[in-house]
Structure formats: structure tokens, C-alpha cells
Amino acid sequence: MENKIIEIFIPGPAGRLEAKYFKSKKNTSPVALVLQPHPQYGGTMNNKVVVETFNTFKENDFSVCRVNFRGVGKSDGEFDNGQGELADAAAALDWIERENFDNSQCWVAGFSFGSLISMQLLMRRPEINRF
């Protein structure tokens, strides 16, 4: 079966989170979470930098997820000044780790506001190996 990028909805603290997901064929592949720029300035998971980062992880055989924060696209909720978005990122990381429990490494990446949230997540989650 060919691996494809699929649309998923991850249960989040403010409702469901719209995401795109690619699962590597290797069970022990590294995982990556890619986060969007600032939602109040038009940032979405479809931002060019986010998509290119996602594709780079995919091409390097990662299982990778990019997610729209609360209130963006088809995600439920509304902007929460970074606190809620950090909780959204944690929920997305929990989801990708459950889907890939044998992962060899855990990476987070983001663009602009997404980098800020990634860094905050990194400080709270010891399983994250790379930023």
C-alpha cells in the first residue's frame, strides 16, 4: 500500500484539531510535528514554509504531522494567546507518539509563532530530541 498524506482530526483540549499526517513505512521511524505561524496574521498549516518543512521530513522517512491550531481552518475553538495553542501542540504530539510508539526520535518544528510554541513544548516534554 502506498503511503499518502491524509487529513485527520486530533482530539484537542478545545475540540478537534485539523491536521495532515504522513506515516512512514518503517515502524521505528522518527516522528515530527510541524507548527504553523501566528493564526491572527493568517498563519495556517498550509503556509508555504510549514508545507516545505513537512515535505522535507516526509522525504527523509519520518512520520510527520502538521496541525492547525484552535480556530484555524476546520479546527474547533478560538485563539488563546499562546496558552491554548501550546495545549493543542501537546495534544498533537501525544497523538503522533501514540500512533508511532516505537519511534526512534521525536522532533518539533515551527515557523514564526509555531517556533515559539515548539520551543515551549520542547521545554516541557523530555522525549523531544530535536528542535
Report residues per predicted region.
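Serine-hydrolase catalytic machinery in alpha/beta-hydrolase-like enzymes
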Residues: 10, 16-101
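Primarily recognizes the serine-hydrolase "nucleophile elbow" in alpha/beta-hydrolase
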Residues: 89-131
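A domain-start/cap signature at the N-terminus of enzymes
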Residues: 1-8
